[in-house]
From Swiss-Prot:
It is found in: Cytoplasm. Homodimer. The keyword Cytoplasm applies. This is 5'-deoxynucleotidase YfbR. GO terms for molecular function: 5'-deoxynucleotidase activity; metal ion binding; nucleotide binding. Catalyzes the strictly specific dephosphorylation of 2'-deoxyribonucleoside 5'-monophosphates.
Amino acid sequence: MKQSHFFAHLSRLKLINRWPLMRNVLTENVSEHSLQVAMVAHALAAIKNRKFGGNVNAERIALLAMYHDASEVLTGDLPTPVKYFNSQIAQEYKAIEKIAQQKLVDMVPEELRDIFAPLIDEHAYSDEEKSLVKQADALCAYLKCLEELAAGNNEFLLAKTRLEATLEARRSQEMDYFMEVFVPSFHLSLDEISQDSPL
């Protein structure tokens, strides 16, 4: 059997730090971020289905979110101000991401490719799936800002403001629910969030 470097590449996502131009109290890597986005995206899909009459596959949404930044193992994590400096750079970076996604898909053994390609290639996502993953991605970046600010790192003040605008632009009923029910706890200490559920 032919060897594949696919998972060896993906394991290196933990070596790519996010927010590279900003001082961080706690460094976050792409692997950690992807897990959190998967959990939040799954929650958004479940909330949409249970509370607001949605009919999405929450497990698929979680998988899409888990792989949503996989191409960064080949491209690196380009800082947002650079990525969106102008429309030409944004468009070129999208093209680079597409090439990187295809390169990852090509690493998968042929007999498994049809399973992994729809997870890695964002063009295979439906509009609804893409929206949920993007909401979760923005929410997790926002939560990172809250954590950094709670630790006294004002470096993230402007990023928080920018992400509030992004969240408003991507707003949905399931996001409103998540923001109301789950986000306030991110302003609390470990002792405060542990009071209601002693071991």
